[in-house]
Amino acid sequence: MRVMIVEDQTMIRSLLESYFRAEDGYRITASLPGAKQAVEVCRTNSVDLILMDVQTENRENGLTAVRQIKAIQPKIKIIVVTSLIDCAVLDEAKRAGADSLWYKDSTQKRLMDVVRQTMAGEHIFPDAPPTVEIGMAKSTEFTKTEL
């Protein structure tokens, strides 16, 4: 399976690459820091799966890229990856045409499960963002406006 990773943080991008290299059947065809680059690569290259960060290099919007990629290559499966805890990201990812969403604070096993399920035609979206600590409080203790 041909995989593209779109993530602006070099360390996270390298970690995601290592996850796929550790599994049989995956080949990383592109690993990019920017969403615009991903759209261009999809115009000329065959890709089966994309892991797309919500906000990439130069503040490029990954969800905009999801829309553009789905318009030119609708069969490509796209998993949005994010660390944002905003509930709106879930809805925006669905509206953009993403096939699934995975939170970066989750495990390698969970990511690979989401990949397998997505490639099997399932759509995996968490019911809610993860709970994170913000100072001495938890994110669930704040309103959407306060977050």
Regions found by a protein language model. Give the residues of each.
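Helix-turn-helix DNA-binding segment
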Residues: 132-147
